[in-house]
A protein has these predicted regions:
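A conserved FAD-binding loop/helix module that cradles the flavin
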Residues: 183-186, 408-429
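Conserved N-terminal/central alpha/beta ligand/cofactor-binding core
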Residues: 15-138, 183, 190
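FAD cofactor-binding and catalytic pocket of flavoenzymes
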Residues: 225-331
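A glycine-rich dinucleotide-binding beta-alpha-beta segment and adjacent secondary-structure elements
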Residues: 339-412, 419
Length: 429
């Protein structure tokens, strides 16, 4: 809401409790603490701030690359103001070019970016500082569900809360985050606005030894590669976490694999984890890609009794399930002990699994050892694409004085562009 006022059904930053902290009660009510609350999905991420317009969102559909990167640098300076690390990777070194060359030789494209790794614990501290600063200039209210928006003469004039209370404002900004995308779709559809999305990413979280990933970790921190498979799909690496931990996220009752890494080396593991995601694009008449991913993920939940499945790559190639005995005999110690050994072949569609295998074999030419039989795959990991409404200058919707922003509006996919999107909306208002 413009008037500086903010309503949110989830929790404030200090009340968010990640299930990773085993001595605490997981904060899953009213929503998952990893993805919901102040700071959104970014607050409990491992805090990779990618300074690039090449990935992390679609702001370049509306602005030039230079304009987007200028705002990203502005957001980056805000993070630095609140104590973010000054360390940043250099994607232009000779060593990076050598890695890129090896990738091209086998059909892998490297996406370069300067990366400022904040770390999960530092990211939370920075978000807390930002929250405290905002409280000095605006009213924040949490655990308050917004039911609808008020529209009069094609102008947004306020919101309706779940308890029936109405709040009026000159401008309304909807930025509900990834887990609020379904809510945003419902609210805007009820107003007659059309939203567009027919894609979802489905894959696994890969975990291997830091030794295997040492060259990538040292020179890139996160190696973002894209690969076109023999079955016509596109696979990408995503969210690499050196010395990281695999975790479980609760997406509205669907348990998904994910990963994070701390900035403090003392909190790290001996493993690196990253996602391998296969893009799934559908044609008519099907128009529920996110539900498709939920159903696949729920099958893994059912087979693992409410958790996620872990399988050794060697067992996948042999067409057999991983057992507790085989997992224990492996050289990679899983950082997510709650994951249940099983068979991802019973869960993932054929083309999805084939795409993942082809990608791992290609990556083995860039980082030798990743295709060894002890590499672990956790499933399912999915990235839901939020439906995107049509927007005008300043990300104003087709309803006057109603603005949308961030991952929940299908405009961004990461810390940098999400922050930039918010700044652009604020400047326009």
């Amino acid at each position: 809401l413009h008037e500086p006022y903010r309503r949110q059904r989830q929790m404030c930053i200090r009340d968010r409790q990640c299930p990773v902290h085993k001595d605490r009660e997981p904060g899953c009510i009213p929503a998952c603490s990893i993805t919901d609350g102040f700071g959104g999905a970014g607050a409990y991420s491992d805090g990779k701030f990618n300074i690039t317009s090449e990935f992390g969102g679609w702001l370049t559909d509306y602005l030039s690359n230079d304009e987007v990167e200028d705002v990203i640098h502005y957001v980056d300076n805000l993070y630095l103001k609140h104590g973010a690390t000054k360390e940043i990777t250099d994607p232009t070194t000779d060593k990076v070019k050598e890695i890129e060359h090896r990738g091209y030789a086998v059909g892998l494209k490297l996406l370069r970016a300067k990366v400022r790794h904040l770390g999960t614990e530092e990211n939370l501290r920075i978000m807390t500082e930002m929250s405290n600063e905002l409280k000095q200039h605006m009213d924040l209210q949490f655990k308050t569900a917004v039911q609808d928006i008020i529209v009069e003469d094609h102008h947004a004039t306020g919101i309706v809360l779940e308890n029936g209370q109405t709040i009026h404002a000159k401008k309304v900004v909807l930025a509900p985050g990834r887990d609020g995308s379904a809510w945003l779709t419902k609210v805007l559809s009820n107003q007659g606005l059309k939203l567009y999305n027919n894609q979802v990413d489905i894959g696994v979280r890969v975990e291997t030894s830091n030794i295997v990933m040492e060259e990538i970790n040292k020179n890139l921190y996160e190696g973002k590669f894209v690969y076109n498979t023999s079955v016509g799909t596109k696979v990408r690496t995503f969210c690499s976490n050196p010395s990281g931990h695999v975790v479980i996220e609760n997406h509205s009752g669907t348990m998904l694999a994910n990963g994070h890494a701390y900035h403090d080396p003392k909190l790290g593991s001996k493993n690196t984890n990253f996602a391998l995601l296969v893009s799934h694009t559908f044609s008519e008449p099907f128009n529920e890609p996110n539900e498709f991913a939920h159903e696949i993920s729920k099958l893994a939940n059912k087979l693992s009794n409410g958790s996620v499945i872990v399988q050794r790559y060697g067992d996948i190639k042999r067409g057999r399930r991983t057992t507790y005995k085989r997992l224990k005999e492996g050289y990679t110690d899983p950082t997510l002990p709650e994951a249940v050994p099983g068979d991802l072949g019973l869960v993932l569609p054929y083309n999805t699994m084939k795409s993942i295998i082809e990608m791992i074999e290609a990556l083995d030419n860039v980082t030798p050892g990743i295709a060894n039989e002890h590499t672990l795959l956790y499933g399912v990991e999915a990235k839901f694409y939020s439906a995107r409404p049509k927007v005008r200058d300043g990300f104003e919707s087709e309803i006057d004085d109603l603005y949308v922003a961030g991952d929940g509006a299908g405009l961004t996919r990461g810390l940098a562009q999400a922050g930039a999107n918010g700044i652009l909306v604020a400047r326009h208002i």
